């Protein structure tokens, strides 16, 4: 017979439901459940005396007849598509259904069939997000990949060949030889990966060669000479082959000013890296491009958010990363021209306005590969504390702000780089690259990372213990990170030209390949979910003050951040 229980008891048993609120880690961000797909009284839950048992919540349906491979029960989804409670069904490494799981023979409204061949992951009281996408990677060392995975990232895009000096400074893999060797190495890594070729050339042939060799994007970097001619040529080749172009512009303004670079774009779509400028770019006003409709602006995480320590740490980082010498006055002047508190403070606010669309790392090259997610939510928290409620919020919650910020490391880089058909959000048909979180540790320490529907990483206790939880508890690779499961669970993103030319067979790799698509004129700033603002941005050349649509953008540096020392005592 039906029974009534309190909201608190229900949340304790099945997790929060419609109207309940959840605090994210130790931030001041509070989400409210917008919808619950369950049928009250028919919830499924695994365990002794629970519902997912033979003849109850578990049906007799085989996998061949439609039962899912895995069900994640009663998870609170935080995604650009909504903040809702649902069961998630996975099949063949992709999201098969979202809604109500169970046994259709005994329960109403079931659209996710649980059968004898179904594994269960308990999502009660947990948060589920899409895996993160870091689109600004210097592949300096392979150990970055495990660090990124353990933080909740499931896709990395960038360039490099290891600790070569070109890679230490620039995110590109130059030439078909290096692209081939890097792709061959990817069979060892549980991570979706895409490579950017070097885009700095004034004639098309070398760039076309790299795209056909497997580059899924091209990178223009000032250390290789980002001249107007190189910009124009690279964008023309990208338009012909449907790959994205990322740009790090000319800090020293040697080959032109920001206006010359904008003119070289000719209105074509481009992804502008560290658009504030501390990571590089026309000094002091590269930030202007964040207001253009054809520019997709991103940040790297060392400037996220602006704190009392930001300026001091940047100078030393820059000297190391760009092969500069503190004993050469010109090198010191170059470094100091890039680090401006005024533009970094404005960057915080432009993120909160939705004018900056993406947050990435700049791994080991003035950025921390394991902190993309942490720095994103620290920025969101700082902005809520300093700027208050966003005008777009409709309830007594931070749902809109949370969707705006999660888009910055999930769907927006996926759209920008032509892979949103496969990753970037929790939607039916997309890859089951998913991250489960305890709300108290949200954004800081994941509870489980799934790659292609297989558990690839998780915190795990002593393997010799009688239960999984005794110390030492730390992150360890799981079965999805070993053997042939790696190639079956993750993919390499390449150009359509490379895929159709049989690159996988030519290189003899096991990991599957997917082609990027719709990276050019079909997208732009307006394609950036919840982050499509195009204010007119001006920078005072003397004071570096930044204005958007005439309004001065400034904020105080944070002295204390959430998601920091409280979580990293050990």
UniProtKB/Swiss-Prot annotation:
GO terms for cellular component: cytoplasm. GO terms for biological process: urea catabolic process. Signal peptide: none annotated. Carboxylation allows a single lysine to coordinate two nickel ions. Ni(2+) 1 binds at residues 136, 138, 219, 362. GO terms for molecular function: nickel cation binding; urease activity. Ni(2+) 2 binds at residues 219, 248, 274. Its cofactor is Ni cation. Pathway: Nitrogen metabolism; urea degradation; CO(2) and NH(3) from urea (urease route): step 1/1. Residues 131-570 form the Urease domain. This is Urease subunit alpha. Binds 2 nickel ions per subunit. It catalyses: urea + 2 H2O + H(+) = hydrogencarbonate + 2 NH4(+). Gene3D superfamilies: Metal-dependent hydrolases, Urease, subunit C, domain 1. The modification N6-carboxylysine is found at residue 219. Substrate binds at residue 221. It comes from Chelativorans sp. (strain BNC1). The lineage of its organism: Bacteria, Pseudomonadati, Pseudomonadota, Alphaproteobacteria, Hyphomicrobiales. Keywords: Cytoplasm, Hydrolase, Metal-binding, Nickel.
């Amino acid at each position: 017979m039906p029974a009534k229980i309190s909201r608190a008891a229900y949340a304790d048993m099945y997790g929060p439901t419609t109207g309940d609120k959840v605090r994210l880690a130790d931030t001041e961000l509070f989400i409210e459940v917008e919808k619950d797909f369950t049928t009250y009284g028919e919830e499924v839950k695994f365990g002794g005396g629970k519902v997912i048992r033979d003849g109850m919540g578990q049906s007799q349906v085989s996998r061949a007849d439609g039962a899912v491979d895995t069900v994640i029960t009663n998870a609170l989804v935080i995604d650009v598509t909504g903040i809702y409670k649902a069961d998630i069904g996975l099949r063949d490494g992709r999201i098969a259904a979202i809604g109500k799981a169970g046994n259709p023979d005994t329960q109403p409204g079931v659209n996710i069939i649980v059968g004898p061949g179904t594994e269960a992951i308990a999502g009660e009281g947990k948060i589920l997000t899409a895996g993160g996408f870091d689109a600004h990677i210097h592949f300096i060392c392979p150990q970055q990949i495990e660090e990124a995975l353990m933080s909740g990232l499931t896709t990395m895009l960038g360039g490099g060949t290891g600790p070569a000096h070109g890679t230490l400074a620039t995110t590109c893999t130059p030439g078909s030889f290096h692209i081939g060797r890097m792709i061959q190495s990817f069979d060892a890594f549980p991570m979706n990966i895409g490579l950017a070729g070097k885009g700095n050339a004034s004639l098309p042939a070398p760039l076309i060669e790299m795209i056909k060799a497997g580059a899924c994007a091209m990178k223009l970097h000032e250390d290789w000479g980002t001249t107007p001619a190189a910009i124009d040529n690279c964008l023309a080749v990208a338009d012909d082959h449907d790959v994205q172009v990322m740009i790090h512009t000319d800090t020293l303004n040697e080959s032109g000013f920001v206006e010359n670079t904008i003119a070289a774009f000719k209105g074509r779509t481009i992804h502008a890296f560290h658009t504030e400028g501390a990571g590089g770019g026309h000094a002091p006003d590269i930030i202007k491009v964040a207001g253009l409709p054809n520019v997709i602006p991103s940040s790297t995480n060392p400037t996220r958010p602006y704190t009392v320590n930001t300026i001091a740490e940047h100078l030393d980082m820059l000297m190391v990363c760009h092969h500069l010498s503190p004993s050469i006055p010109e090198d010191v002047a170059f470094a100091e021209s890039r680090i401006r508190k005024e533009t970094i403070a404005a960057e915080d606010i432009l993120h909160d306005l939705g004018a900056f669309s993406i947050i990435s790392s700049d791994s080991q090259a003035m950025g921390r590969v394991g902190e993309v997610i942490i720095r994103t939510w620290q920025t969101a928290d700082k902005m809520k504390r300093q700027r208050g409620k966003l005008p777009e919020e409709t309830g007594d919650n931070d749902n809109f702000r949370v969707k705006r910020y999660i888009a910055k490391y999930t769907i927006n880089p996926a759209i920008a780089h032509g892979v949103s058909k496969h990753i970037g959000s929790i939607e039916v048909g997309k890859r089951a690259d998913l991250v489960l979180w305890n709300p108290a540790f949200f954004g800081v320490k994941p509870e489980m990372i799934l790659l292609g529907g297989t558990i690839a990483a998780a915190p795990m206790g002593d393997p010799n213990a009688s239960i999984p939880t005794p110390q030492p508890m730390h992150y360890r690779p799981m079965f999805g990170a070993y053997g042939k499961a790696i190639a079956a669970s993750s993919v390499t993103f390449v150009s359509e030209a490379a895929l159709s030319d049989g690159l996988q067979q030519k290189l003899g790799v096991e990991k599957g390949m997917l082609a990027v698509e719709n990276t050019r004129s079909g997208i732009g700033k307006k394609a950036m979910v919840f982050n499509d603002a195009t204010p007119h941005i001006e920078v005072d050349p003397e004071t570096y003050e930044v204005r958007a649509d005439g309004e001065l953008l400034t904020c105080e540096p944070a002295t204390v951040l959430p998601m920091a020392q409280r979580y990293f005592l050990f």
